[in-house]
Amino acid sequence: MRKDVTPMMRQYLNIKDKHKDAILFFRVGSFYEMFFDDALEGSKLLGLTLTKRENVPMCGVPCHTSKDYIKKLILLDKKVAICEQGLQTDPKGPLEREVVEVISPGVVIDEDFLQDDINNYLIAISDYKDYYSFSYIDLSTSRLGIILYEGNFLEKLRRDIEKYSPKEIIVSEDFYYEYLEKLALDRFLVNKIPHWHFDKEIAMKSLKEHFNVLSLSALGFKEDEPYYVSSFLIIDYIKNNLKNLLINIDTIHINNDSEYMFLDDVTQINLELVKNNNDLTSCYSLYSVLNDCKTPMGKRLLREYILNPLLDIVAINNRLDHVEFLNNNINLSMKLRDILSNVWDIERIISRLQMKKYVKKDFLLIKESLTAFFLAKRLLNEHSFSYWIFDVNDENNIREIYSLIDCSISKEPDELIQHGYNFEIDRLREIKNNASKYVDDYLNFERNFSKISSLKIRRINVRGLFFEVTKSYYGQVPSHFIESQTLNSVKRYKTNKLIELERDINDAEDNLLALEQEVFDDIASKIVKHSVVIKKIANFFAYVDVVSDFAYLAKKNEYVRPTLTNNKEIILECSRHPVVEHYMKGVEAFTKNSVKIDNDKYFCLITGPNMAGKSTYLRQTALVVLMGHIGSFVPANQAIIGITDKIFCRIGASDNISKGESTFLVEMNETANILRNATQNSLIIMDEVGRGTSTNDGLAIAYSIVEYILEHIQARSLFATHFHELSAIKHDSFVNLSMKIERQGDELIFLREVEEKPSLNSYGIYVARIAGIPLKVIERANVILKSLTSREHLYVPEFFTSATLVINDGEEAMKEDLSYELELNDYLELKNFISKIDVNNITPFQAMNLLSEIILKTKT
């Protein structure tokens, strides 16, 4: 440290040294100042003017507007350390200063920094002693959870990072560098903790102290299996950065992985469950279609349901029963949704109360939400709705909370505590509000007593209140008047009564603020004692919101209740893609398609041209199956769905430049994951596997994958391909499907309907033509196609000579499709020739020659 720095700058450098990874907001008077590198970075990110003092770069923001600047930095994934100033304990030194909190993207609780429909997660990953675990917390809702990894660690971790989309991650330094590329950790704000900080004994002690338990078994852990280290990392991080904001974390939820369908990260992305792959917003996702929830808690729960489909038929049917009840009683559902629209985010509000970060509005919003609770209770009781999670004691506590807020918190904008709740507050407020009246009353009393008609009471800051008497009345001044100042034409006086009155008025203002805050804090502490029941209300509202939303959408979109079974089957009659149908509404009618997969016929190969609807058919099947598992009605006329332990969706791929992986390698990695982890109870969706390499290589790989799924995994599968040769496979569980096409003259009409037969042509040249490929290229492609189709053994390479392949099946259909393609190309060539004839600029003789040429072309 430089020896010539000022005491304040030395103080700054000492504090900054403890918060190297944060931008330090250093309080100086009414500003937060930034210095050195923080000033350089802060001025650039916040658009502030950069200045210098004694060659030290600096910039600052006013304290009263600092929230806006902090928000900007948080949105840019920066940490902000807030350093406040206190008293000057050393006359020769600077004011006392300390960091009161470190605000970072993963631990924000201010509603202005949050989205109401998305949880804001901080996660910690621990690999201590090879006990892998993943802990997560949304501090704004106080929910801390942990997932224990006992196998397939990396696949599950990828899944959960995608599922929780954390704002911030805590890992060991060793873990970070080992898995940086495998998990693409550089996408996130990562806190790298020294490996020595990972200690089982310290973790146990810290968790026991925080949760006030004698043994971690009370939290559901075995102390000799230190999975809990990841939860310790979160508790320790919050404790060090947010001081006293741990009170709201009162339990750890241990997730049971086996209760939920496995959706790996690739499947979540490819099915666009909660965000699209274009701008990563929720628009055009399944969530955007299903989200017509009325409450923030309901929106967040819906997102959780979509990412965690249930596997237990009883639990699914319980949820479906509630949806069906509300669907059959749609008037009840609509009234309930009206009530829910008056419910506020009490899950986050009660967390703010627990962390002592509340404002008056929070109490009024709780009260308004409790009013909605009583209305909802009465409505549901009238219709005998079966879902109720409260006992008599809960209901008494809820009424107590409502009564407390109703009688204590003022609705008036300039008052905190309601009149009548506290006598002393009423007295002080009455003095404050009527100060001028008291002064006027006393002035009138002294005027009458002294007979001085011009007597006045004035006030100046340095002297306070005083009487003012002009020269002509000096002789009438009462004896109890105490002279305080003489001017040219007037004298100023005080009285003991005036001094007492002034003191009462001044004290009333100061004491009122302090007493109101004291009483306000007391009310908050009384409500916090009932935080468990308030969180219960939040959970109740969230669930009722989601099931009433499902009921409303089922009625609106003509969804049906699915039947869940333990059989290996997916039978969907006239199913639709929920997202495509939603966004096409009013533009084009969606083409319905059926799906029939059972224990005997479980592998469907789908062929046909691009643009015909193969990918839509694949995705809609997966989405309908998933919707059934979350307890929603589904877009179909009938749906029978066998419980599906995992959905794998390999559709589309792009290269990963940062990892040096080509599109083909990415595709093979995804395929390898499916083949390693799928079971016979899974659903596999694969599209165009084998592209990106040579035709023979791709065909060989695709065939081998189909064979492996059929013979070894035996999972329900939909496999779309342009390798038409695969349609000749013969297997008892193999079904050929294709996209129906209608020919109208020289045009192809894609009907987007699925039929049970192979398509042996992709009509690629036709698709290229309507896409606008230059005609010269199209003509050349036709020539090359004729050459290729004249070769022998084009469609059946030598390695397809096994007994599982039937070469002759579909050969006639193949020839028919090829013949049509060639005829279409000849027609287009002739059409192009005729269209170039300029009839206004040819002689009769030239016309005869052209006609002869046209006749010759039609014959050949």
From Swiss-Prot:
It comes from the Bacteria. InterPro entries: DNA_mismatch_repair_MutS, DNA_mismatch_repair_MutS-lik_N, DNA_mismatch_repair_MutS/MSH, DNA_mismatch_repair_MutS_C, DNA_mismatch_repair_MutS_clamp, DNA_mismatch_repair_MutS_core, DNA_mismatch_repair_MutS_N, DNA_mismatch_repair_MutS_sf. One of its GO terms (molecular function) is ATP binding. SUPFAM superfamilies: DNA repair protein MutS, domain I (SSF55271), DNA repair protein MutS, domain II (SSF53150), DNA repair protein MutS, domain III (SSF48334), P-loop containing nucleoside triphosphate hydrolases (SSF52540). Keywords: ATP-binding, DNA damage, DNA repair, DNA-binding, Nucleotide-binding. ATP binds at residues 608-615. Pfam families: MutS_I (PF01624), MutS_II (PF05188), MutS_III (PF05192), MutS_IV (PF05190), MutS_V (PF00488). GO terms for biological process: mismatch repair. Transmembrane segments: none annotated. GO terms for cellular component: cytosol. Belongs to the DNA mismatch repair MutS family. NCBIfam families: mutS1, PRK05399.1. This protein is involved in the repair of mismatches in DNA. It is possible that it carries out the mismatch recognition step. This protein has a weak ATPase activity. This is DNA mismatch repair protein MutS. It comes from Borrelia turicatae (strain 91E135). The lineage of its organism: Bacteria, Pseudomonadati, Spirochaetota, Spirochaetia, Spirochaetales.
